[in-house]
Amino acid sequence: MAAPIVDAEYLKEITKARRELRSLIANKNCAPIMLRLAWHDAGTYDAQSKTGGPNGSIRNEEEHTHGANSGLKIALDLCEGVKAKHPKITYADLYQLAGVVAVEVTGGPDIVFVPGRKDSNVCPKEGRLPDAKQGFQHLRDVFYRMGLSDKDIVALSGGHTLGRAHPERSGFDGPWTQEPLKFDNSYFVELLKGESEGLLKLPTDKTLLEDPEFRRLVELYAKDEDAFFRDYAESHKKLSELGFNPNSSAGKAVADSTILAQSAFGVAVAAAVVAFGYFYEIRKRMK
């Protein structure tokens, strides 16, 4: 499929879609599953073959029925409502925009979003996403395949500060933090505490303490939330652009024109979302 023409009209549609996603995510308390959708569409990238990645292919039944994507049909259906109002926006852009907004409205860092991804109907083979039962070498194999680094592995793992695992989807149950609708560094704080009643630690979480370089970053992020936010924003942007080469001048213009408005609105919405966080159990099926 052809890449979209990122002109003034397309950028206006992106702005409108961003606004609608903010409202949707705040009202439905669905930030965790929107972030998961963005990650899982992007996380299939293979740098060597240049296949997979954030191309919207996860919308196809062949891919969203992969075991690792269990439950993501909820997020796909929610995005369809936004797509119907803004048909010019590609699914690839929409899913990554949803992930950026999910972090933003729950109090996380601003992530620069550059549109222009093209859609694909070619689905990668199952098995490219991380297996939660594996150790640190598996994480390196998966992330290095995408062209990402150790810092990216640990920073992106911090995204588990949002949401919870569901046994019918992954075989695991429970949230990683006490406030699973708040994006902060508590994932790392809880990880260093060890086992805590009611909180989840996957094998892929625990293994971050077994490798010296991973542990160094865990300890840094646990004590310095600003460092975590800075590195997370950088790593999330890298993940969202795997295999995507935006025009540099257009990308800079988009970033410069949106980051200030994104920042100001995000603070207000984040406060509202966090305030309602205690009701997450009522709406947990929407995560």
Curated annotation (Swiss-Prot):
K(+) binds at T161, T177, D184. The modification N-acetylalanine is found at A2. GO terms for cellular component: chloroplast; chloroplast envelope; glyoxysomal membrane; mitochondrion; peroxisomal membrane; peroxisome; plant-type vacuole; plasma membrane. The active site is at H40. It catalyses: L-ascorbate + H2O2 = L-dehydroascorbate + 2 H2O. Signal peptide: none annotated. Disulfide bonds: none annotated. Keywords: Acetylation, Calcium, Glyoxysome, Heme, Hydrogen peroxide, Iron, Membrane, Metal-binding, Oxidoreductase, Peroxidase, Peroxisome, Potassium, Transmembrane, Transmembrane helix. Binds one cation per subunit; probably K(+), but might also be Ca(2+). Plays a key role in hydrogen peroxide removal. This is L-ascorbate peroxidase 3. It comes from Arabidopsis thaliana.
